[in-house]
Swiss-Prot record:
Pfam families: Ribosomal_L19 (PF01245)
UniProt entry tagged with the keyword Disulfide bond: no
Keyword Transferase: no
Keywords per UniProt: Ribonucleoprotein, Ribosomal protein
Gene Ontology biological process terms, A to Z: translation
HAMAP family referenced in this protein's UniProt entry, alphabetically: Ribosomal_bL19 (MF_00402)
Name of the coding gene: rplS
Name assigned to this protein: Large ribosomal subunit protein bL19
GO molecular function: structural constituent of ribosome
Length: 115
């Protein structure tokens, strides 16, 4: 059992910033196309974080061409280059699934956290 824990702790990233639900983030993801590798930025609102340790994931939602797009990323994945927090949001829920029902500007209406 300790062997699994030590292997998992070696795989954990050290440079993961503090972010939570309601925050607007930019996720820099490595995309491999044939032999080329490039970085794609996915910007949106974090609607959930779940799991712990090596299996921790977070889901980011954004509106692209009038359609809601959600992507789930493992926090400690080598494909996730970095996560930038652009805006801190203040929410009262752990899971922001109610944003799925909102349309237009209301889909992004989240109070900004006071400093």
């Amino acid at each position: 059992m300790d062997i699994l824990r030590t292997l998992a702790s070696e795989q954990l990233k050290k440079d993961v910033p503090e972010f939570s639900n309601g925050d607007t983030v930019k996720v820099h993801v490595k995309i491999k196309e044939g032999s080329r590798e490039r970085i794609q930025i996915f910007e949106g609102i974090v609607i959930k974080r779940q799991g712990g340790g090596i299996a921790e994931t977070f889901t980011v939602r954004r509106i692209a061409s009038g359609v809601g797009v959600e992507r789930t990323f493992p926090v400690h994945s080598p494909r996730v280059e970095k996560v930038e927090v652009t805006r801190r949001g203040q929410v009262r829920r752990a899971k922001l699934y109610y944003l799925r029902d909102r349309v237009g500007k209301a889909a992004f209406k989240i109070k900004e956290k006071r400093r």
